[in-house]
Amino acid sequence: PQEAPFTISELEEIYPAASAKSKADEVFKERAHQATLKLQRGYAPYRAIWQHIMAVSVADLKKNYANLNVEFDLWKGESDAEPYIGDMIQMLVDKGLAHESQGALVVDVAQDTDTKEIPPCLVRKSDGASLYATSDLATIVEREQDFKPDRYIYVVDKRQGMHFEQVFRVAKKAGIVKEDTPMIFLGFGTMNGKDGKPFKTREGGVMRLEKLIEEINEAVYQRIMENRTVSEDEARSTAAVVGLAALKYGDLSNQAAKDYVFDIERFTSFEGNTGPYILYTLSLIHI
């Protein structure tokens, strides 16, 4: 199809529904595996749908980042590393680093100095499909070719620490990256609701950034309108600025690696250690 046959909201419903169905239905799960394999091998109909998924997703990401005044020089997806995967896998085999284990291809990365178990890094499934580690390694190959970085810094969910430890070790063991090149993992925690669990909507779904910004702006707007000293339009425009401060300061004022509770009521307060209070204080200084 020329136009995307779905919206970002529909995609957000399809993905968890398909994930849940694959856990309960083995036949469906196998069909999903086969579809993934065909997609990775370039099957045109699946690639066309995938292109629409990418376009819709990236457009939504760019819109949300624009709301936060955040820009990126490059927008690179996991699939950008795909052309490098075949040669990289062959290189791992030729160097004797990758070997078969239960039909899959793995690279041993454990070291004598390890204080905990580091499992082998799985780089190809038994059906020939690629995994996250495969793409991450191929991405490093691409970055070495294009940028030759002095160091790598990965800012990712802290729960991915083991994964990237494996990837970094394979990259250095295979000579993709020089042994003395720093490869740093900076893990961050999750933003949780008052119940201590990852933020969700009132309906129980995953909280989208766009929805979170809307709720924060509305909370700030209601606080501004309590004094009834400004027009509704002024209150809305002010709420957008103050709401952004509440979100950014609420997030950045916590230790990056720790999970924390994002309490909208507290973080939108004009009192205490909050973004709105800092803006309020700044406005008084300039009076």
Predicted regions and their residues:
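NTP-dependent nucleotidyl-transfer catalytic core
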Residues: 1-285
